[in-house]
Amino acid sequence: MLLLIALLQGCATQLAPRPGSAPHDADAAPEALVLRFQNSSIAPAGDEAVMAPEALQPGDILLTSMSGFTSVGIRLMTFAPVSHAAVYIGDRQVVEAVGSGVRVRGIEEVLEEETVILVLRYPDLSAEQARNIKDYALKKSGTGFNYLGVTLQIPLSISRRLCELPLVPSALRDACIRSMGVISQVAASESRLFCSQLVLQAYRHAEVPMTDADSRLISPADILHMREGDVSSVRIHRELRYAGHLKYPTPTMVALQR
């Protein structure tokens, strides 16, 4: 039944070591492997998962969603519960790419406006790498928004579901998505940025590439699936760690949003 649902949704899968076995064991016996499905749940594990802004670290990635039309449309298009990505640069400041361009916002404003805020953290990020991420993000402040890149994400988000069918090997899935994104790579600007593109580019500038895939192909949903225990649609260098939620609605609010 789970496999049938995954087939209908184009849900990516991956054979992974069974919990408790040695990680990254290429010679693991088939019985030591389990079929892992892409996970779209972002519900916190409990009250302990809700973090204070003071616990944020420079370089943290904020994945968010709102109740507005644009956010809902992006979530429907990408089959994910998040619609926006931003990077925390320290000093209670966040850099993000929105319709008006790349801007700096205070964390208090982000907390007030967003409905859900999930925080992912790149493991073992050094202070120097975090500074380079900050420098790049601030340098891009005022840069125009990549409207064409976002527009081209619409057909790509639909067509790439073929690449994400269950049991498609990760290497083939990665190559398939890259090939389908050729038009985006040729037509979409690299000088203008949309939200997840900014995050990927900032990390790449700091010589900590999250993936070798073109940043114009990556959506906030793709970043979500780069977390530990999930199945990334594209090949990644390191899994992102879940740091916690800055904000998550009560069950009543979740029911109303649905």
Please report, for each region that a protein language model flagged, where it lies by residue:
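Bacterial N-terminal signal peptides
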Residues: 1-10
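Cysteine-nucleophile amide-bond enzymes
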Residues: 10-258
